[in-house]
Amino acid sequence: MLSALVNKVSDKVQVMGGTAQDGAGGTKSVCAIDGVTQIATDVVTQTVTDVVTQTATEVVAEYVKMTGAGRARLVPVSYVDELLATLIAGGASVVEPLAGVPVEVCDIKGRAAAGELLVVDVRTIGAEFSPACRLGAELAVAADARVPGYVVVCMRKCCIPWVAEAVEAKACSAEDVTVAATGAEEQASARVSRHAASDAAQVVAAYLACHPRVEAVRYPGLKADPSFARATSQLVGGFGPYVDYMWKESPGEWHRFTATDEDVRAQIINFERLG
């Protein structure tokens, strides 16, 4: 019975292509998935089989494009906490694109437009999901397996001088950084995994939305979700792996399902066994 229901939900995921303008005036393909809207970026995703030799300078340039930044620098991991502390002391707020329980999409564009100095940490969700600097964030902090031991700090075009100076004080030249031999494959695999987890979360959210024991579901990709409009204009490539839900027998108590890149049917069946 459960297997049949899982198959029904999964098989109902039909992709219908279309296009829409993103928040920066670019185009995205919009896929309607049985009430769940999936945003697919037009940036070509690097795959595990598409591994090429790159320099650290090229890696940095890739993040400038992804985040919509004006420039980017490599900062040793050992200096990151000190850099963030300096920025916070100067009035910056460090946020993530997806945060809170129940999960919601941070309004980077709205908060930046209101004058808030934002540093967006995209190390968890992946820079490919959030064009943070294009949306107005002063900085975006990313991680990449090709440059282990460093973070990529992306700076908005016309970055506030003191913020740029704080970054430059901790940064090193990309020309002095050697790309890890296996880093390209690891990074490509991580991106594929994140996208697969996001796709799985779409199905899990749709499944939980019609579950007889579930009182409420929060997932940015559901049309009924409070963050849906913001998610479709500020995220690209998917809505992340987090699905929060509330059992009818435990009102007010949120639980989190974190999707993975494994087969979604198996994830749902395991969820039911544990639940």
Kindly give the residue locations of the regions a language model identified.
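Long, highly charged amphipathic alpha-helices
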Residues: 4, 8, 197-203, 267-270
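N-terminal glycine-rich, Lys/His-bearing helix-loop that initiates the first secondary-structure elements
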Residues: 4, 13, 29, 56-70, ...
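N-terminal intrinsically disordered, low-complexity tails
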Residues: 7-39
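Long, intrinsically disordered low-complexity tandem-repeat segments
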Residues: 36-57
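Conserved PLP-enzyme active-site core in the AAT-like
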Residues: 59-212, 218, 224
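Conserved small-domain helix->loop->beta segment predominantly found in fold-type I
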Residues: 202-256
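Structured C-terminal cap/extension of enzyme domains
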Residues: 251-275
